[in-house]
Curated annotation (Swiss-Prot):
Keyword Repressor attributed: yes
Domain of life, source organism: Bacteria
Keyword Ribonucleoprotein part of the UniProt annotation: yes
Protein name (Swiss-Prot/TrEMBL): Large ribosomal subunit protein uL1
Amino acid sequence: MAKKVFKRLEKLFSKIQNDKVYGVEHGVEVVKSLASAKFDETVEVALRLGVDPRHADQMVRGAVVLLHGTGKKVRVAVFAKDIKQDEAKNAGADVVGGDDLAEEIKNGRIDFDMVIATPDMMAVVGKVGRILGPKGLMPNPKTGTVTMDIAKAVTNAKSGQVNFRVDKKGNVHAPIGKASFPEEKIKENMLELVKTINRLKPSSAKGKYIRNAALSLTMSPSVNLDAQELMDIK
């Protein structure tokens, strides 16, 4: 098994040049050619930003609804009450509740990919914050997941909303589609993501904003992208 994996990786690495920087269009083309798994691999972009997340004013966090979705069926949980529960259900939410949902989560129920809540339910959500937080599921106003417009939030989540947040080392990782997507759709999704991240550049960030960029599949080596080209996307 290990020998087969090594041969597969060796073949993939032979298709790229480690020290080469690719333009967006060529990079997408190369990454698609690396698809070799028996499942539809996820295309992921990784950006190294010139920010220091230790400073609150340099924390880059937000959300973007990809033009062509992520290719993944997203299950959405909503914390709401009264008429807002009905709005959530009508919009297609998979799980809707209040204190009862919090109790289910405490008992181990995590069968959803995104959590949305109305502002008045955040006290209830806070009771399971230690469970949701480490899994990246805690609702936040910056990602549009704490809102009174529940229908819109659920629709966005189902349509391919991607939430992103810079990590401690200044990196942002985000899925932008599947290997089966046409090149143009992958490219357009990536440009929409990068455009959003560029808009969120902190005024206190110094020097080059996007320092490095790479594109990869779930089971492939990464391809280096032209960071300057990405910074020029408005």
